[in-house]
Each structure stands twice: as structure tokens, then as C-alpha cells.
Amino acid sequence: MAAGSRTSLLLAFALLCLPWLQEAGAVQTVPLSRLFDHAMLQAHRAHQLAIDTYQEFEETYIPKDQKYSFLHDSQTSFCFSDSIPTPSNMEETQQKSNLELLRISLLLIESWLEPVRFLRSMFANNLVYDTSDSDDYHLLKDLEEGIQTLMGRLEDGSRRTGQILKQTYSKFDTNSHNHDALLKNYGLLYCFRKDMDKVETFLRMVQCRSVEGSCGF
């Protein structure tokens, strides 16, 4: 191959790779504090979404005189995430390393990526919220990517990719008039709220340890 042709090919290859290299470099230049701020904002939004949806579902479909029995039913009292070893109190949380807490948070987020696509389909009135199932999914997906980026920065400086959890929660049932469906959805929403609370708590702990001046909130 002629020298000129070889040079042209190398130049073309470099131009094709430039956007990727710029993006990879951009992640490295973003201050760690900003990465944490963004992840914490998304974690808080996900937690608030879980709280609001749980309360709305409870007020809409669960009779007050049956709330206790619903909450203590075996189908609603056990969460899939209970099979993931997670700290159960602040003392246990403090004993976990930053990467351990981020990995647990990533597991929890990934277990909800598919179910959250059907989160709002439970409600007969889909106008209960201003956003859509797609927005909910992208919120968790963005949080997943943010946690992966933090793991890479804290571990070796590179962004981690690829899901590490294959098993997830089941989908929400759209049959709001069926007792079993109500029980299933109520249990799923209980678990969603519980898991998002853990994610926000774990991320706050890692941020406090990693970013100076971020513990006083």
C-alpha cells in the first residue's frame, strides 16, 4: 500500500475514534463531586418516585381496613432484593467499602430496569403523573450509568459497563380489579420503595466518604 494511502487510512481511523476518545476523556475531567451530585439527584428522584407511586396506589386501591393484612401477606412482605446481601442498619453500612456499596446499589437498580417500564400501567388513569413509563426507565438507566461511572473512577479510573444482574423483579400486573394482582403490585411497590431508599442511603454514604464537605446535609 502506498504511503499516501496508508496515511489517509490512519487519518480516517483517527477521526472516527476522536469522538469516543473525547467522550472518555471528558468523563475523566468531570470532578468527582459533580458525578456524585448528579447520581444523588437521580437517586433522590427515584426514591421519591417510589414513595409517591406507593402512596398513590395504596390510596387508590387498598381499603384502609385491609391495609394491615395486605402488608403482612407473604407475597408482599418478601422482596427479591432480600436475597442480595445488603446492610440492614447504619453500622453494617459503615462497615462496607465504597465499591461494595456501589455494587449493591447497582444490583438494586438493575433489578428494577424492566419492571419500571410497566410502573404506571397499574393505574386506570394514566394521567396520575406528568411523566411516562419511558421517563421512569430512563431515570433508572441514567442512575445505573452514573453508578457505573463512579465505580470506575473509584476503582481504576475507567467507566464500568455491562449489567451484572440477570434476575429481576416480575412485571407489574395491569389487572387492577383482581385481588391477586393488587396483592402482587402492592408488594412490588413496597419493595421498590424499600430498594430505592437503600440506594439513596448507600450513595450518600459513599459521597460523604469520597467528597470533602459533602457530609453536612
From Swiss-Prot:
The keyword Magnesium does not apply. Its main location: secreted. Zn(2+) binds at residues 44, 200. GO terms for molecular function: growth factor activity; growth hormone receptor binding; hormone activity; metal ion binding. It is found in: Secreted. It holds the Pfam family Hormone_1. GO terms for cellular component: endoplasmic reticulum; extracellular space; vesicle. Keywords: Disulfide bond, Hormone, Metal-binding, Secreted, Signal, Zinc. GO terms for biological process: animal organ development; growth hormone receptor signaling pathway; positive regulation of receptor signaling pathway via JAK-STAT; response to nutrient levels. Can be found in a monomeric as well as dimeric form. CSH2 sequence only differs from CSH1 sequence in 1 aa. This is Chorionic somatomammotropin hormone 2. It comes from Homo sapiens. The gene is CSH2.
